C-alpha cells in the first residue's frame, strides 16, 4: 500500500491539508451551549434535573428499550449490569480478549473472574463457535446453574462486545447461553445508532450498556447508559446507581449497598443536544465509511464493513493489513504526518493483571491484533454541516 497516497486521501476527505486529524473528536453544532446555560441558570448542575430524566427518556425511545438508566460512564453501566445479572464474587464471566479494558475491568469490579474466548474475524466480536466449543468441553449444569468443571466456579454470565459499533453474532450467543443458563450482558459501549435486523444493539440481551465518552458517536463528556426491557431490572438499576437511597423528602435512608454512579444534569444536557443531531452524525459517518471502503478496495486492503442485516454506526473505521510489519509502518508514517491512526487494543490476556485468567485458543484475536488499524472517523464538515 502507498501510505503517502493514503494520507493524502484522508486529508482530502477531511478537508485538512496540514492540520492534525484526530481519530474521533466531538462536534458541537446544536443546542449544547443553550442547554448548558439552562443548567447553570437554574443551578441544576448535579445529579438531579430536567436533562437527566429527558436524556433517559430520549435514549429509551431511540433504542427501543423500555428502560434506560444513565450512569457517569460506560464502565459503571457494565458493572451494574453484571450485578443485576446475579454475578457474585468468585463467579466466572465469559468475554472476549479483543476489547477495551473497561469490559474486563467491569467483570473484576463485580468480583468475578474473566474467561477469555476467541472472536470471529468478520465481526471482531465473541465467536459463537468458540463459545460452544468451550462450554461443551468445560461446562456442566448443576440444577439450573452452569459450572466450570476444571475450576469448580459458577459460570454466571457472558459479556460479548459489539466492536467498533459492528454487531457480533448476538442472537447465536444468546441461544447458546440460554441452553447453559448463562446470563448475557451486552457490551454495546461503542454501538449507539447501530442495528441488527432492525433492532438496536444493546437491546437483544436482558441487559446491556452503552457509552457516551468524549470519543463516542455522541458524547456527554463522560457517561453511560444501562438498557433493559425488564421493569424489575430497570428500577433496581436506577436504585443502585443513586446510592440505593429510598425516596423521601428529607430523610437519608439507604436499604442496600449502592453506588455513586449518577450522571450530572450538566452532562445529560450535552447528551440531549447530541441525540438531536445523531441521525445527521450517522449519515455523515456512513458517507465517510463508504468513501474509505471504495478507496481501500482499489488498494487491495480489507475495510471492516457491515455484514448482511447490519446497519453499523461506523464509530471507528478499521482496516485489516497483511501483517504486523505493514501495520507498524502504517502507524508510524500516518502519525508522523499528523493523521492519527492506532492499533486495535492489546489483547486482555496479555496484560499483567489478567494474564493468569482462563482462556481458550485465541488464534483469531491474535491474528486481528497484529493487523487491525483504526483511521480517522469523526464527523466531517461537509457543506458547513
Label the model's feature ranges.
Residues 45-92, 106-108, 116-118, 140-150, ...:
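Phosphate-binding glycine-rich loop
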Residues 111:
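Structured binding elements
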Amino acid at each position: 500500500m502507498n501510505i503517502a497516497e493514503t494520507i493524502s486521501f484522508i486529508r482530502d476527505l477531511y478537508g485538512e491539508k496540514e492540520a492534525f486529524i484526530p481519530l474521533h473528536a466531538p462536534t458541537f453544532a446544536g443546542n449544547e451551549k443553550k442547554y448548558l446555560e439552562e443548567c447553570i441558570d437554574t443551578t441544576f448542575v448535579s445529579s438531579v434535573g430536567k436533562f437527566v430524566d429527558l436524556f433517559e427518556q430520549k435514549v429509551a425511545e431511540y433504542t427501543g428499550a423500555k428502560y434506560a438508566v444513565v450512569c457517569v460512564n460506560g464502565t459503571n453501566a457494565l458493572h451494574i449490569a453484571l450485578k443485576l445479572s446475579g454475578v457474585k464474587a468468585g463467579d466466572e464471566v465469559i468475554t472476549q480478549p479483543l476489547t477495551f479494558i473497561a469490559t474486563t475491568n467491569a467483570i473484576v469490579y463485580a468480583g468475578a473472574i474473566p474467561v477469555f474466548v476467541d472472536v470471529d474475524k468478520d465481526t471482531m466480536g465473541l465467536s459463537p463457535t468458540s463459545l460452544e466449543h468451550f462450554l461443551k468441553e468445560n461446562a456442566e449444569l448443576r440444577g439450573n446453574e452452569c459450572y466450570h468443571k476444571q475450576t469448580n466456579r459458577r459460570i454466571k454470565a457472558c459479556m460479548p462486545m459489539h466492536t467498533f459499533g459492528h454487531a457480533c453474532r448476538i442472537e447465536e450467543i444468546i441461544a447458546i447461553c440460554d441452553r447453559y443458563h448463562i446470563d448475557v450482558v451486552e457490551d454495546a459501549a461503542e454501538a449507539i445508532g447501530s442495528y441488527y435486523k432492525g433492532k438496536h444493539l444493546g437491546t437483544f440481551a436482558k441487559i446491556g450498556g452503552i457509552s457516551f465518552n468524549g470519543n463516542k458517536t455522541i458524547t456527554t463528556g463522560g457517561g453511560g447508559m444501562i438498557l433493559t426491557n425488564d421493569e424489575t431490572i430497570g428500577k433496581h438499576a436506577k436504585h443502585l446507581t443513586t446510592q440505593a437511597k429510598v425516596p423521601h423528602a428529607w430523610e437519608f435512608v439507604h436499604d442496600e449497598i449502592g453506588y455513586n454512579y449518577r450522571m450530572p444534569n450538566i452532562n445529560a444536557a450535552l447528551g440531549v443536544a447530541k441525540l438531536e443531531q445523531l441521525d445527521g452524525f450517522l449519515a455523515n459517518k456512513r458517507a465517510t465509511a463508504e468513501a474509505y471502503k471504495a478507496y481501500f478496495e482499489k488498494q487491495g486492503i480489507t475495510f471492516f464493513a457491515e455484514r448482511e442485516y447490519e446497519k453499523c454506526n461506523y464509530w471507528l473505521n478499521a482496516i485489516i493489513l497483511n501483517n504486523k510489519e505493514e501495520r507498524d509502518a502504517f502507524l508510524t508514517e500516518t502519525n508522523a504526518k499528523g493523521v492519527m491512526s492506532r492499533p486495535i487494543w492489546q489483547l486482555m490476556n496479555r496484560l499483567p493483571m489478567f494474564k493468569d485468567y482462563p482462556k481458550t485458543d485465541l488464534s483469531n484475536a491474535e491474528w486481528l491484533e497484529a493487523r487491525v488499524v483504526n483511521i480517522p472517523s469523526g464527523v466531517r464538515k461537509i457543506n458547513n454541516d
